[in-house]
Amino acid sequence: MSYVPIVIEQTSRGERAYDIYSRLLKERIIFVCSTVEDHMANLIVAQLLFLEAENPKKDIYMYINSPGGVVTAGLAIYDTMQYIKPKVATLCIGQACSMGSFLLCGGEKGMRYSLPHSRIMIHQPSGGYQGQATDIEIHAQETLKIKRLLNELYSKHTGQDVKHIEKSMERDNFMSPEEAKKFGIVDNIISSRNATGLLTK
């Protein structure tokens, strides 16, 4: 069982307790710090929509430390990031692999960051369906469609040619922050909050 710290704040009405993630949400900070799956994606989508309702003109900061996960869950988060009015800055802490790197790449252009010792990994989607031969073929075709979709979206956000994206994602492709910047996944590598005014209140 994971432990989530509680922080206490003094208000005019007395003390108020928050779990650490709820307190950071007040500062418009969202954490994508686990495997990307449906339940987690629903929570992230809800937070994005909540922050838009709170202030549609104020930026949102998404911190990513994720090994990746389910493509459709990641696309739900990605589509919401593009749909809402606030700009979404993304910052890789630790790792952004698979769908984690996709979400990192999908942040607002010029507002995609990595800390200096993070790792970023891209690869093609994988499937593991079992069943009748016809159903396996159907799922294989769907996986290929998803592969083409992700290639096109990576191309859109990185500026790389689709063929170069496809070749780069043929196998697990690990990158340093410098390599990810050259590839177009992130815009800047930062080592302190002072390195960018965007992450300073």
Curated annotation (Swiss-Prot):
The keyword Cytoplasm applies. GO terms for molecular function: ATP-dependent peptidase activity; ATPase binding; serine-type endopeptidase activity. It is found in: Cytoplasm. One of its GO terms (cellular component) is cytoplasm. Cleaves peptides in various proteins in a process that requires ATP hydrolysis. Has a chymotrypsin-like activity. Plays a major role in the degradation of misfolded proteins. Belongs to the peptidase S14 family. This is ATP-dependent Clp protease proteolytic subunit. The lineage of its organism: Bacteria, Pseudomonadati, Pseudomonadota, Alphaproteobacteria, Rickettsiales. The gene is clpP.
